[in-house]
From Swiss-Prot:
Main location: secreted
Entry annotated with the keyword NAD: no
Gene3D superfamilies reported in the protein's UniProt record: Single-stranded right-handed beta-helix, Pectin lyase-like (2.160.20.10)
Protein's recorded name: Putative galacturan 1,4-alpha-galacturonidase A
Gene Ontology CC terms: extracellular region
EC numbers for this chain: 3.2.1.67
Amino acid sequence: MKLSGSSALLLLGFGLLGHASPLVHVQGKNCTVKPLGHGQDDVPNILHAVEKCGQTPGGRISLPAPYTYRINQRMTTHLESSTLEVGGMLLFSDDITYWVNNSYRIDFQNQSTAWRITGHDYVVDGGPERGGIDGNGQLWYTWAKGGSNVFGRPMPLHVLNSTRAVLRNIAIRQPQFWAVLVESSSHVELDNFYVNATNSDPNATEDTVWIQNTDGIDTYRSDHVTITNWVYEGGDDAVAFKPNSTNIHVENVTVYGGPGIAFGSLGQYPDRYDIVENITVKNANFQPSSQRAMNSGIYFKSWIGVNFGVPPNGGGNGHGYVRNVTVEDITFKDVQLPIYIDTCLSYLFDQNVTQYCDTSTFRFDDLHFRNISGNGLATPTNYTGRNITFAVSMICSKEAPCTDITFEDVDIKLPESYSGKSVLCENAGVQGLECNS
């Protein structure tokens, strides 16, 4: 039978994207994917390799260096007792309209994700050269123009419904939004990550440099998560413990720029009870980047106790607690607000929300800080509705005073020219530091 030219091309297209693709080499339990090139979408071939080798015990999918793989559509890779090697680079497409309209939605702050990894007993490994992700973030930074939580910006890596998972040796450059979200998962290890969000748009002049919302990693509804050996350079939280994050261990983290490590935000939704409990942060270093100031180091944030506005930037009157937290072996260099608690959170900056600063019922208890050194900049802030400066601020809500907060071997120097208060305490039971207020 003789095929017409158009029929032959059609069949060839099915061959490239279907099970007979010559760019997916299958040998037993091992699958290797080569990219199509020329901007063509590699997602179908990656998913085919995962189907063939990703759910078989001992299976292995390889996306080797030095190749770049185009991710032109959302994808879910389900792995069971297998390994995904990402030695190459996953480059997300620049089709903003597609991603805004088609990314996976999550039920927290109307956020979105682009690549979901689900399953159990799996490994995702970037290899010795740390392959990983290029989120094509610059176009998103310019598109959002410094707006907070602009709808539709997708997170490039979403660990979802996963148990006994290991992700290691991964670089994420120019994430579109938060780089990594671990959600509804348990016993997850994330080791040796590098995350960098850098803006090159000269129109960005404000303090955020348009790279806010480029968190390194957020945990949400997850238990027993280990985060070790991370380097983060960007414009937002390096690590953030979102609602119902329990038994989290963070160690050996270097942070360049942004707000630092956050416990929150919490208490945003009035119909939810948020718990953050059994958290350890050990051996973390904070300093400014070439683009972004180091706004804070370790901080805790809960929403106002009045449901004002709607998420992602409004809300409040949620309930819950942060309990059993240990923060130790911390170094600050030129950090504006080294350690503080904020119970007056809202992102409706043009509204008079500070009138609700003493309304939060969210509780912070059993917080312990030890072996902390470095310097703060005594930068003025008005997050409480007052103009204040400090090295440590434990200002808690009258409706939910903080209890059992201890400090041991803490030495945070402020500028010699600064003559104001260094330790602020209100509605807080603090031991180990002399409160000035």
